[in-house]
Curated annotation (Swiss-Prot):
Interacts with CDC5 and CDC14. Phosphorylated by CLB3-CDK1 in metaphase which is required for correct localization at the nuclear envelop and the spindle pole body, and dephosphorylated by CDC14 in early anaphase. InterPro entries: NBP1/CSA1. A motif (CLB3-docking) lies at residues 189-195. The lineage of its organism: Eukaryota, Fungi, Dikarya, Ascomycota, Saccharomycotina. This is CDC5 pindle pole body anchor protein 1. Changing S170A: Reduces the phosphorylation rate of CSA1 by CLB3 and impairs the recruitment of CDC5 to SPBs in metaphase. Its main location: nucleus. The PxxPxF motif called the CLB3-docking motif mediates CLB3-specific phosphorylation. The CDC5-binding motif contains phosphorylated Ser-170 and is essential for tha recruitment of CDC5 to SPBs in metaphase. It is found in: Nucleus membrane; Cytoplasm, Cytoskeleton, Microtubule organizing center, Spindle pole body. Residues 142-221 are annotated as: Disordered. Residues 166-188 have a biased composition (Polar residues).
């Protein structure tokens, strides 16, 4: 940079001395001051919002108590302030508040359903006209009967019978290892008197008499 001077056809140029500045330091300092100012402003605004909201709420309560203003007017005066105050509330709190409100709505529905169910059951009991004292007395009688019951007698022991060796020694009930170790002679039928020789034929029944009697059934014609 320089300043040009014209005097009588002579052109002179005078240079100005430029002092170097610490630009980075100045920038950081300005940014810090700005951030501090923004923080202070945001804190002040939040305090003002909260203070104004509390004042409006207390004023609405005083008006409702003194002049007897209805609750609708009080709600109308409070709602816009609460909307303005939502700007200061973090987003996480808003999401949590919405979730809690939804849970409250669902629990209110469940409570209403349970109340209606209890009311219906009570009406059914009233229609049946059941005496509670009668039920209690019957319950007490059943308990007394159970307490006075005699203990059941123990069953006699089952008779002990000898095991049939023919069944236990049959090759069907033996393992394959035992059947291999058993000699072939043991599998053959025992030698001795024939068991079926005692019964050469089936026993015969007595033949009915051909002459009908009074006790006999009449023949069908």
């Amino acid at each position: 940079m320089g300043i040009q001077e014209k005097t009588l056809g002579i052109r002179k140029e005078r240079k100005l001395v430029v002092v170097p500045r610490e630009r980075n330091h100045v920038r950081h300092a300005s940014q810090r001051t700005r951030s501090k100012n923004y923080k202070n402003i945001s804190k002040k605004r939040a305090q003002q919002h909260a203070f104004g909201f509390n004042i409006a709420k207390t004023l609405a309560k005083i008006q409702a108590f003194v002049w007897g203003s209805p609750a609708d007017e009080e709600e109308e005066s409070v709602v816009p302030l609460s909307k303005n105050s939502q700007d200061c509330v973090p987003l996480q709190w808003q999401a949590k508040f919405a979730q809690l409100r939804q849970q409250l709505h669902s629990t209110q529905k469940e409570l209403q359903f349970v109340k209606e169910k209890c009311h219906l059951l009570q009406s059914v009991l009233d229609d049946a006209n059941i005496d509670q004292r009668y039920l209690e007395s019957r319950r007490d009688m059943k308990n007394i009967e159970r307490d006075n019951l005699k203990p059941t007698e123990n069953l006699p022991p089952s008779p002990v019978r000898a095991v049939n060796p023919l069944v236990t020694s049959s090759p069907i009930h033996m393992s394959p290892l035992q059947s291999r170790q058993r000699p072939v002679s043991s599998l053959q039928p025992p030698k001795g008197p024939n068991f079926y020789a005692k019964y050469p034929k089936l026993p015969q029944t007595n033949i009915l008499r051909e002459s009908p009697t009074e006790d006999s059934v009449p023949h069908a014609e």
